[in-house]
């Protein structure tokens, strides 16, 4: 979408003021447009009835109000999770997932930040795709707008854990996160928004320096500095030692816990030794939480751990650290909507819309 003709979605209030002034409109119109986009969730400019018809016509003539195009809508028979495929250009697809956990009414949308991914994490299907670029801020936010409209409900939490590496699209991701947080827009609390990374230390350090208020998660997945590269190629450029240093800096300077995500893979990163190494990292970082996730994908030749293997690993981990440990469930596995499965070809369920 060419910005020679400005796109209203994805803009901050200040940016909308600049657009209004450039069109000869009163500056206060920006606040009306802003709340109309993000709070009222209007799908067309004609719905902005707080604006005069003359103003609406001027906006339609000189600005754009696009939507990402809905493709597939798969519904899990197991837990009600829904995975949406959206088209953002010719041969460019992204996915977002609606996760109704049922835990105290928590409703999460997992959104994408890139078309494909710049990294190649061996357990993640997105890494198999050709990288086709960063998403613009409006395309990130429109995933939330579209999913909420399609499910007829509002999210309580947003996680940037879909397709792509958020730290490689830092500006657009953080801009979207701040709009999601704004009380005049989506109105989500900062700690209901989680930004994730596979371990891009430059992005983590920038996040710290900017004193960003959001939750932050690191996809760790191996506690051994040398072996981690065999699971995640990001470790070659951003070694585990520097990653842990950044995590320590995060907890010290921002004075809040960081989350480590750990995909459990038998014969790769499980067993007592790896549990003890992971616990040592947790102790050194001090303020952290650990989410352990059984491997979901099977294209790697690796297998999903058994329940007993998971229990054994978590038991050894708990014996060596006081950090909170969550055995994260994997909603949407039957529609390839769980962690690491985005971009895998799903089987349309009988409840597909």
UniProtKB/Swiss-Prot annotation:
[4Fe-4S] cluster binds at residues 117, 121, 124. The active site is at 95 (proton acceptor), 339 (s-methylcysteine intermediate). Pfam families: Radical_SAM, RlmN_N. One of its GO terms (molecular function) is tRNA (adenine(37)-C2)-methyltransferase activity. It comes from the Bacteria. One of its GO terms (biological process) is rRNA base methylation. Its cofactor is [4Fe-4S] cluster. This is Probable dual-specificity RNA methyltransferase RlmN. It comes from Leptospira biflexa serovar Patoc (strain Patoc 1 / ATCC 23582 / Paris).
């Amino acid at each position: 979408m060419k910005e020679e003709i400005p796109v209203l979605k994805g803009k901050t209030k200040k940016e909308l003021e600049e657009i209004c002034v450039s069109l000869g409109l009163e500056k206060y119109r920006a606040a009306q447009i802003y709340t109309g986009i993000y709070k009222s969730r209007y799908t067309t400019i004609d719905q902005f009835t707080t604006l005069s018809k003359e103003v609406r016509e001027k906006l339609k003539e000189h600005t754009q109000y696009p939507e990402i195009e809905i493709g597939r809508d798969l519904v899990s028979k197991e837990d009600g999770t829904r995975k949406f495929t959206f088209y953002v250009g010719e041969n460019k697809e992204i996915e977002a997932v609606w996760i109704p956990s049922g835990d105290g009414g928590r409703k999460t949308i997992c959104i994408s930040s890139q078309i494909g991914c710049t990294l190649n994490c061996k357990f993640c299907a997105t890494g198999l795709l050709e990288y086709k670029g960063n998403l613009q801020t409006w395309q990130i936010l429109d995933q939330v707008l579209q999913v909420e409209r399609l499910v007829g409900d509002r999210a309580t939490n947003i996680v940037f854990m879909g397709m792509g590496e958020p730290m490689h699209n830092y500006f657009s991701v953080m801009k979207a996160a701040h709009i999601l947080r704004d009380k005049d827009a989506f109105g989500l609390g900062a700690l209901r928004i989680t930004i994730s990374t596979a371990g891009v230390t430059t992005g983590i350090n920038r996040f710290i320096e900017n004193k960003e208020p959001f939750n932050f998660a690191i996809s760790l997945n191996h506690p051994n500095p040398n072996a981690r590269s065999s699971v995640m190629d990001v470790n070659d450029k951003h070694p585990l030692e520097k990653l842990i240093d950044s995590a320590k800096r995060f907890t010290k300077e921002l004075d809040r816990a960081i989350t480590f995500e750990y995909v459990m893979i038998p014969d790769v990163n499980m067993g007592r030794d790896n549990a003890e190494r992971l616990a040592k990292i947790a102790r050194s970082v001090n303020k952290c939480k650990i989410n352990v996730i059984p491997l979901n994908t099977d294209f790697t030749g690796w297998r999903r751990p058994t329940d007993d293997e998971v229990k054994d690993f978590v038991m050894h981990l708990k014996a060596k650290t006081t950090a909170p440990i969550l055995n994260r469930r994997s909603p949407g596995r039957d529609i390839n909507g769980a962690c690491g499965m985005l971009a895998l070809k799903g089987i349309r369920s009988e409840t597909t819309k």
